[in-house]
Amino acid sequence: MCGRFTLYSAFDDIIDQFDIDQFFPKGEYQPSYNVAPSQNILAIINDGSNNRLGKLRWGLIPPWAKDEKIGYKMINARAETITEKPAFRRPLVSKRCIIPADSFYEWKRLDSKTKIPMRIKLKSSALFAFAGLYEKWSTHQGYPLYTCTIITTEPNEFMKDIHDRMPVILAHDHEKEWLNPKNTSPDYLQSLLLPYDADDMEAYQVSSLVNSPKNNSAELLDAENHM
């Protein structure tokens, strides 16, 4: 699964890298070293003409859901079954997004009692994009709530040593394909959801402070040398 990530890159870098045409005021951007489910996260959609940057709550709530609690169980969608699950089939065709990040955290199991937090990033330290889906849900008061999920897939050779799942990091040339609303073939879209190139990734152990979403400072990026 993918349950924590970082996004602390400069706002202008995000705008430039993902060719964003419409976005909220720069002053509203807050870098985060410990993005967690149920938070409002940055996401990019394409409206047919422009790439738009906005905020979606992490944890997808299908339109037919009776209440928003289901969102806590839907922070991830499995790429292998995304065309089958009722909650994901519709947004796969019509409500796709990408979620910018500069690293993510995963907990590596050492034994039956011990797990250690690992920070995973690209060797280049470059920004990248998770593949995501979003939905619009109406509260009982009739207010719209926009939510999202991050898609996961089987681990590549690098990630296998850390976890049995990994988030889908889209290849750069696949980002536009994923966002393009003209692409509506479920099979084609599913074919874009591949494990990222293992040779381009690296990881290191970080402090257990990252275990709590309440902790959110640059020191979470520091390496722990206890492996």
UniProtKB/Swiss-Prot annotation:
The protein's gene is named: yoaM
Instruction: Print the keywords alphabetically.
Output: Covalent protein-DNA linkage, DNA damage, DNA-binding, Hydrolase, Lyase, Protease, SOS response
Q: What is known of its domains?
A: The N-terminal catalytic Cys-2 residue forms a thiazolidine linkage to a ring-opened DNA abasic site. Glu-106 catalyzes reversal of the thiazolidine linkage; self-reversal is favoured by duplex DNA formation. Glu-106 is also involved in sensing abasic sites in single-stranded DNA (ssDNA). His-163 stabilizes the abasic sites by forming a hydrogen bond with the O4' hydroxyl group.
Protein name as catalogued: Abasic site processing protein YoaM
PTM-bearing positions, type Thiazolidine linkage to a ring-opened DNA abasic site:
C2
Q: Which biological process annotations from GO are given for this protein?
A: protein-DNA covalent cross-linking repair; proteolysis; SOS response
Site (Required to stabilize abasic sites) residue list: H163
Q: Which residues form the active site?
A: C2 (nucleophile), E106
In terms of InterPro entries, this protein maps to: SRAP, SRAP-like
Function comment: Sensor of abasic sites in single-stranded DNA (ssDNA) required to preserve genome integrity by promoting error-free repair of abasic sites. Recognizes and binds abasic sites in ssDNA at replication forks and chemically modifies the lesion by forming a covalent cross-link with DNA: forms a stable thiazolidine linkage between a ring-opened abasic site and the alpha-amino and sulfhydryl substituents of its N-terminal catalytic cysteine residue.
What regulation of activity is recorded for this protein?
A: Formation and reversal of DNA-protein cross-link depends on DNA context. Catalyzes formation of the thiazolidine linkage in presence of abasic sites in single-stranded DNA. Mediates the reversal of the thiazolidine cross-link in presence of double stranded DNA.
EC number(s) per entry: 4.-.-.-, 3.4.-.-
Q: Which residue numbers mark the site Required for sensing abasic sites?
A: E106
Family, as annotated? Belongs to the SOS response-associated peptidase family.
Q: Name one GO molecular function term.
A: peptidase activity
